[in-house]
Amino acid sequence: MGARASQPYEIKERIDGKTVIVTGCNTGIGKPTAQEFYRVGGRVIMACRDVSKAEKAADEIRKEVELSFPHDKAGKLIIKKLDLSSLESIRNFVDDLNDSEDQINILVNNAGVMSPTRKTTADGFELTFGTNYLGHFYLTLLLLPRILASAPARIVNVSSLAYEYGRIHWDNLSLERNYGMFTAYSQSKLANILFTRELASRLDGMGVTVNSLCPGVSATDITRFYGGVIRKIWGYLCPLVQKTIPEAITTILFCALDKSLDADSGFYYSDCARKELAPHALSEEDAKKLWDLSLTLVGLEEFPVKDNKADGLRIVAA
């Protein structure tokens, strides 16, 4: 699982005037991530499934920042409903965002779930794959025209070391047979990395970078999905490997903001350092196959980019 070696990331420059989207940020590592963007002047879109919980989180963020930082120096928190397990909700979110936001400078695809039993999304996909990967795939592609128009911009996909144990079950993608919580989770996190590499390749030279990362092990609400025995084992192991929340969000902030990554795209990071991927995550064939399959699953039709212009990429509902 790796050591808890990283130090909290120090943001060196303010981001006044920049718009940042963070998915799943009413809890877990998403919340302090949103807080840091807000603290240094960002216009932060809190994209959350539960609006009431997001409002409570936003109030807590504002109070926390006010305690240690002049409030007039902070940015703005904007709450928008986004349920990544529903394609309709994603479309509604994007429509709303396109009406209210002129630019998207940073997209942090952070939201994630685990489920001890097999469940499905509103559209019939296995819940973990549908939320952690496919929902973010659909969201990112629908937002691409606005992101490209805002270049330079960054897309940050939160993955996990669990990808090393994952594989794409091409003939059983929704795990209707032999479902397992970690099988589903590791598949979704591998998919995040394959998507990152394929999208980075397609956006090469267009001013938008795409990177993935492992934040490390931390005490987040995702552990609520663990069963009793696993939770007990986790209780023993946790102190040995768990990162503090400031440590856990370090690599997210690094990938989103650090100037040293201005030209880096398609890579995987942990503890603020580029890491070599396992061989099965480097398969260009699998990345392309997953891309094409994902387009079909969410009902999108892609047209080629022309002359490296943002308006040359058209993605429309089929």
Model-predicted segments: where are they?
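Rossmann-fold NAD(P)H-dependent dehydrogenase/reductase core
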Residues: 3-230, 298-309
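Residues within alpha-helical segments
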Residues: 35, 55-58, 197, 249, ...
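C-terminal helical subdomain
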Residues: 90, 188, 212, 236-277, ...
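Universal eukaryotic N-terminal targeting presequences
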Residues: 1-2, 317
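A broadly tuned preference for mixed-charge, low-complexity surface segments
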Residues: 99-100, 161, 262-272, 304-318
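Amphipathic terminal alpha-helices
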Residues: 280, 287-318
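Juxtamembrane interface at the ends
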Residues: 231-235
